[in-house]
Design a protein with these regions (language model features):
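Transmembrane alpha-helix boundary signature
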Residues: 1-10, 47
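Extracytosolic (periplasmic/ER-lumenal) interhelical loops and adjacent juxtamembrane/interface segments
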Residues: 7-24
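Long, contiguous internal "core" modules enriched in hydrophobic/ aromatic residues
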Residues: 27-197
Length: 197
């Protein structure tokens, strides 16, 4: 079929770079790692949701409450570690960076992690403002919303720093194997979109 139009590494024959990356970039590893990653995200998310539902459905005394706090902390910690490991390393490499498999960047996974984090904080902030305006979240005040804004601003700066650092290093080195990523984005049909990101 035409699978190789997205992932050129599916047909690495005759390409020494793609053949060298075939231990990581191959259909079997891609499928297993994708199923494992998403599967664990779902399982850990369902477990945390079920614990939360248990807490909501019955009154607790102090000792039971402490047990649930510990339980939720353990499961949330496991999820955060798994999510960070996958979103800050393997997932961006495998799903996104491998679209252009000749190009690589050690900063790319951190860049995608920071952009995911900024998007998450922005979405949380919008939900908090919406729910606050609807009369929910009575304990949330302007300081909380301001803190969310500061947090979002800080990670936006971090995201921008990573993007600029990656772009500047690739631009300055002017190596063909590195500029291959930016050339079609800065000179092609996506120029405006690229510079407004």
């Amino acid at each position: 079929g035409h699978k190789h139009h997205i992932y050129h590494w599916l047909t690495p024959e005759g390409d020494k770079i793609l053949e060298g990356k075939s231990g990581f970039l191959n259909p079997k590893f891609y499928c297993i790692w994708t199923v494992l990653t998403i599967g664990l995200w779902i399982l850990l998310g369902k477990k945390m949701r079920s614990i939360s539902a248990e807490i909501d459905n019955k009154p607790l005394n102090v000792e039971e409450g402490k047990k649930y706090v510990y339980k939720t902390t353990v499961w949330a910690s496991l999820f955060i570690v798994w999510f960070a490991l996958t979103v800050a390393s393997t997932t961006p490499w495998l799903w996104l960076m491998s679209i252009d498999a000749h190009w690589y960047s050690t900063m790319y996974s951190w860049y995608t992690f920071a952009s995911t984090f900024v998007a998450g904080i922005a979405l949380i902030t919008l939900f908090v403002i919406y729910l606050k305006n609807k009369g929910y979240l009575e304990l949330v005040n302007q300081e909380h919303i301001h803190d969310l804004g500061k947090f979002m601003f800080a990670f936006s700066i971090f995201w921008t720093y990573l993007w600029f650092s990656q772009f500047m290093l690739i631009w300055y080195s002017n190596q063909p194997e590195e500029t291959i990523y930016f050339k079609p984005r800065t000179e092609g049909a996506f120029t405006t979109l690229f510079w407004t990101q």
